């Protein structure tokens, strides 16, 4: 990491020159606002679920909702910025990441690192206003994403996806711990398990779509090292596991369980049918990726709505 930070020379890139980006665009690319938004959904699911299961009121927890949202956005953005600093050498090789400010030179590594540190400190302070435990999980999430995933496993093993899925499951814990210290409650434990499983076929789809990029950058993603067939079988394994894990929601709500079950079955059917009927593997993977986002958004939004209705109308 030290070698990466001290080298301020712009990595060689085959990207075509482009016009100067606005400051807002540069900032958005640096902190990865798309990832921030997508991670706030499960954070809110964990938050509202925690309020519901612990029989809390909406009004009394407005400060915690604000602090956990702002704090989570900041620490997730910090993690993205740290990742941009460390990965800028391979980002310069892959077309999908060549426009990142740390590659184009619009943001230096030192400036990006400084931004990440400031965002992390402020984000943790804001999360601490919700609860010290939420801040602790925020720090844990950043650590897991930056060190075990980005620095240790991403460039070394095909199991980088499994390691990355652990950090990806932290946002619901941040939300839950903002309002409750009972982190062993079955509701959040089951939610975290589903979150970990969901990430596997999601990131396998990304790896297939960008297989050429990862291969060029020598990133050992599963389809690069083991090929498409192994990735397809492993994707289906996790989708079957996701179907089975849908029943974990049964004790919370039959409705949520059915939503999770139907979405997961549809995803598996799409995987099997799409793989065998479509010779274009990238096109198949793109559909799988899009559906994974649909799956997450619908399922977690259902959890949020169910929990909020229960909290507002006190349906404990």
Curated annotation (Swiss-Prot):
One of its GO terms (cellular component) is plasma membrane. It is a multi-pass membrane protein. Its EC number is 2.5.1.141. GO terms for molecular function: protoheme IX farnesyltransferase activity. It is an enzyme of class 2 (transferase). The chain crosses the membrane at residues 62-82, 117-137, 163-183, 188-208, 231-251, 252-272, 293-313. Pfam families: UbiA. CDD domains: PT_UbiA_Cox10 (cd13957). Residues 1-24 are annotated as: Disordered. Carbon 2 of the heme B porphyrin ring is defined according to the Fischer nomenclature. Interacts with CtaA. PANTHER family: PROTOHEME IX FARNESYLTRANSFERASE, MITOCHONDRIAL. This is Protoheme IX farnesyltransferase 2. It comes from Lysinibacillus sphaericus (strain C3-41). The gene is ctaB2.
């Amino acid at each position: 990491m030290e070698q990466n930070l001290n080298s301020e020379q712009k990595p060689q890139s085959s990207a075509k020159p482009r016009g100067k980006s606005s400051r807002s665009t540069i900032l958005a690319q640096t902190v990865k606002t798309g990832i921030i938004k997508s991670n706030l959904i499960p954070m809110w699911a964990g938050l509202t679920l925690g309020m519901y299961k612990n029989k809390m009121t909406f009004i009394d927890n407005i400060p915690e909702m604000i602090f956990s949202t702002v704090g989570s956005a900041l620490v997730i953005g910090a993690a993205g910025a740290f990742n941009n600093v460390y990965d800028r050498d391979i980002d310069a090789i892959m077309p999908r990441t060549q426009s990142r400010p740390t590659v184009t030179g619009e943001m230096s590594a030192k400036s990006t690192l400084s931004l990440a540190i400031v965002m992390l400190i402020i984000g943790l302070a804001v999360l601490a206003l919700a609860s010290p435990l939420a801040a602790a999980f925020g720090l844990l999430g950043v650590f897991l994403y930056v060190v075990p995933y980005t620095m240790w496993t991403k460039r070394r093993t095909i199991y980088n996806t499994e390691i990355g899925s652990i950090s990806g499951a932290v946002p619901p814990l941040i939300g839950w711990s903002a309002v409750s210290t009972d982190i062993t409650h079955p509701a959040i434990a089951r939610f975290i398990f589903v979150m970990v499983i969901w990430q596997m076929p999601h990131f396998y789809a990304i790896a297939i779509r960008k297989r050429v990029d990862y291969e060029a950058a020598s990133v050992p993603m599963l389809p690069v090292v083991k090929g498409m067939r192994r990735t397809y079988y492993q994707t289906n394994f996790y989708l079957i596991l996701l179907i089975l894990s849908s029943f974990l929601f049964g004790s919370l709500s039959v409705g949520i369980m059915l939503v999770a079950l139907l979405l997961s079955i549809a995803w598996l059917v799409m995987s099997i049918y799409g793989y065998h009927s479509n010779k274009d593997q990238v096109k198949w993977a793109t559909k799988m990726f899009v559906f994974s986002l649909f799956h997450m958004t619908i399922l977690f939004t259902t959890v949020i709505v169910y929990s909020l209705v229960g909290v507002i109308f006190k349906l404990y």
